[in-house]
């Protein structure tokens, strides 16, 4: 089911979307697929699949370790897309590919767009591609998810709105991804600023890890992105792989209950 329909259904039920970020094929392909199935079973609504990259500037310490882990395993954009096709065959979640721009540029925009369509990718996030350059990929017929930050000007917010995206990824704080405390009132004011310009659903990410954070932004954001918190579970249970999917499922269930 594609992203817009899923988000519309959740909005009708007055539920927030739970968007899970997981690095493609880490620790290995089969275990990663088991983890993704567990996330789906636990109530995850959309899946964000990361492509390992050598210089992940937008990512914090935890996710950066997963990028380097994937690079050591020889993972790249082509293998990430091959794995995305396996994910598409294994689960029904709308699938968002998260990739930095340099690997896309090296692959070539035409080939990248075609391979995304072949793999069943529903949308793409490119965190280091400026909003005013997203048109390079939009012209390839891809669904692009723009990212905004609390520092985004009204003109940047309007630029994101003009893309008519399936949703806007609202970075919760200045800086990189990671588990942290969040300035609740500042974030709510920021979301309202975006809401005044765009009718697109808003997904809040960077720092969401606890059920109380999901509860705090219910009614303000249309979805939350969980990444570093899941990555920490994967790190903790890597040596006990039989337990890992179940722990991810439990975390998703706990977060989804409050969405």
Curated annotation (Swiss-Prot):
What is its quaternary makeup?
Tetramer of two alpha and two beta chains.
Q: Reaction catalysed?
A: (1S,2R)-1-C-(indol-3-yl)glycerol 3-phosphate + L-serine = D-glyceraldehyde 3-phosphate + L-tryptophan + H2O
Leader sequence range is none
Q: What is its EC number?
A: 4.2.1.20
Say which species the protein is native to: Syntrophomonas wolfei subsp. wolfei (strain DSM 2245B / Goettingen)
The record's comment on protein family reads: Belongs to the TrpA family.
Q: Catalytic site residues?
A: 48 (proton acceptor), 59 (proton acceptor)
Q: Name one GO cellular component term.
A: cytosol
Query: What does it do?
Result: The alpha subunit is responsible for the aldol cleavage of indoleglycerol phosphate to indole and glyceraldehyde 3-phosphate.
**HAMAP family (UniProt xref):** Trp_synth_alpha (MF_00131)
What taxonomic ancestry is recorded? Bacteria, Bacillati, Bacillota, Clostridia, Eubacteriales
UniProt keyword Nucleus, yes or no? no
| An example Gene Ontology molecular-function term | tryptophan synthase activity
Keyword match Amino-acid biosynthesis: yes
Which key words are in the record? Answer: Amino-acid biosynthesis, Aromatic amino acid biosynthesis, Lyase, Tryptophan biosynthesis
**Pathway stated in the Swiss-Prot or TrEMBL entry:** Amino-acid biosynthesis; L-tryptophan biosynthesis; L-tryptophan from chorismate: step 5/5
Q: Which Pfam families match?
A: Trp_syntA (PF00290)
The molecule here is called Tryptophan synthase alpha chain
Enzyme class, top EC level, equals lyase
Xref: InterPro entries: Aldolase_TIM (IPR013785), RibuloseP-bd_barrel (IPR011060), Trp_synthase_alpha_AS (IPR018204), Trp_synthase_suA (IPR002028)
């Amino acid at each position: 089911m594609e992203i817009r329909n899923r988000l519309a259904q959740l909005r009708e039920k007055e539920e927030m979307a739970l968007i899970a970020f997981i690095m493609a094929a880490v620790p290995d392909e089969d275990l990663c697929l088991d983890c993704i199935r567990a996330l789906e079973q636990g109530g995850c609504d959309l899946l964000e699949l990361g492509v390992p990259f050598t210089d992940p500037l937008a990512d914090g310490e935890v996710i950066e370790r997963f990028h380097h882990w994937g690079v050591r395993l020889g993972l790249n954009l082509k293998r990430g897309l091959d794995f995305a096709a396996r994910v598409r065959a294994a689960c029904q979640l709308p699938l968002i590919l998260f990739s930095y721009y340099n690997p896309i540029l090296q692959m070539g925009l035409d080939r990248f767009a075609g391979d995304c369509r072949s793999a069943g990718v529903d949308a793409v996030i490119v965190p280091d591609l400026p909003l005013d350059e997203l048109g390079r990929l939009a012209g390839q017929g891809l669904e692009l998810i723009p990212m905004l930050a609390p520092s985004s000007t009204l003109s940047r917010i309007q630029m994101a709105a003009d893309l008519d995206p399936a949703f806007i990824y609202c970075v919760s704080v200045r800086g990189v991804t990671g588990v942290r405390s969040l300035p609740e009132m500042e974030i709510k004011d920021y979301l309202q600023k975006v809401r005044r310009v765009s009718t697109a659903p808003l997904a809040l990410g960077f720092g969401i890890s606890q059920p109380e954070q999901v509860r705090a932004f219910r009614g303000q954001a249309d979805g939350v992105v969980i990444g570093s918190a899941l990555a920490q579970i994967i790190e903790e249970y890597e040596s006990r792989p039989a337990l890992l999917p179940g722990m991810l499922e439990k975390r998703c269930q706990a977060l989804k209950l409050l969405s």
